[in-house]
C-alpha cells in the first residue's frame, strides 16, 4: 500500500519527469499533451494499484509459490500459493510473511473445492522450506460460517489466538488462529 502522507513524495506538479510533453516543433505531435494516468505511473497516487512484480520461489507438479518483490526491504512480503487440485481446479491462498510468521487470510464466501489440500500443502511448504515459526490464519468474526471454520481449522491443528497476543495486530473484528511450527523438532528429522 502506498503511503500518500509520506513527506518524501513530491507533488506531481513538481516532478520534472512527470510533466506533460509540449509541442517543441510544428508538425506531428511527438507526444500527447495529456498526462499519463496516475495509476500507470510507478509510485503514482492514483486510484489504481501499481502492478506488482513477482518472483517464482518454488514449483512442483502441484504447488507453485511466488512472492511479490518488495519495494522497500523491511516491509512484509506477500506470498502467493497456488495448488493444482485437478487440471481445471486450482486452490489459491495469499499470505504475508513477517517476522518468521506467515499470515494467511481466509477469503469471504465458501472455500473452494480443494482448499483443504491447498492449505495442507501451504503448511508443509511453510514448515519445510520457509522455516517459519507460526502460520496464522485470519477471517472476519462476523462471517456466517464462523463456527464451521473454527471446527475445521481446529481439526487441522490450529488454535484460537487470544486477544493481546504479541504476534498479531489488535483487530477486534478479525479472528486469528495459529498453527505453531516447532522448528527444533523438524531440524532433527
From Swiss-Prot:
GO terms for molecular function: ornithine decarboxylase inhibitor activity. One of its GO terms (biological process) is positive regulation of intracellular protein transport. SUPFAM superfamilies: Acyl-CoA N-acyltransferases (Nat) (SSF55729). The keyword Methyltransferase does not apply. Signal peptide: none annotated. PANTHER family: ORNITHINE DECARBOXYLASE ANTIZYME, ORNITHINE DECARBOXYLASE ANTIZYME 2. This is Ornithine decarboxylase antizyme 2. It comes from Mus musculus (Mouse). The gene is Oaz2.
Amino acid at each position: 500500500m502506498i503511503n500518500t502522507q509520506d513527506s518524501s513524495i513530491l507533488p506531481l506538479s513538481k516532478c520534472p519527469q512527470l510533466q506533460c510533453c509540449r509541442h517543441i516543433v510544428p508538425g506531428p505531435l511527438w507526444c500527447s499533451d495529456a498526462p499519463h494516468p496516475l495509476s500507470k505511473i510507478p509510485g503514482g497516487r492514483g486510484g489504481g494499484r501499481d502492478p506488482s512484480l513477482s518472483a517464482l520461489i518454488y514449483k512442483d507438479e502441484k504447488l507453485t509459490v511466488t512472492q511479490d518483490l518488495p519495494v522497500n526491504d523491511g516491509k512484509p512480503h506477500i506470498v502467493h500459493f497456488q495448488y493444482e487440485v485437478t487440471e481445471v481446479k486450482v486452490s489459491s491462498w495469499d499470505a504475508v510473511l513477517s517476522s518468521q510468521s506467515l499470515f494467511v487470510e481466509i477469503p469471504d464466501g465458501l472455500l473452494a473445492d480443494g482448499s483443504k489440500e491447498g492449505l495442507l500443502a501451504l503448511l508443509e511448504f511453510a514448515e519445510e522450506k520457509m522455516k517459519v515459526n507460526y502460520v496464522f490464519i485470519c477471517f472476519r468474526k462476523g462471517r456466517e460460517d464462523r463456527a464451521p471454520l473454527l471446527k475445521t481449522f481446529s481439526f487441522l491443528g490450529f488454535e484460537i489466538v487470544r486477544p493481546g497476543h504479541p504476534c498479531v495486530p489488535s483487530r477486534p473484528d478479525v479472528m486469528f488462529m495459529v498453527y505453531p511450527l516447532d522448528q527444533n523438532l523438524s531440524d532433527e528429522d
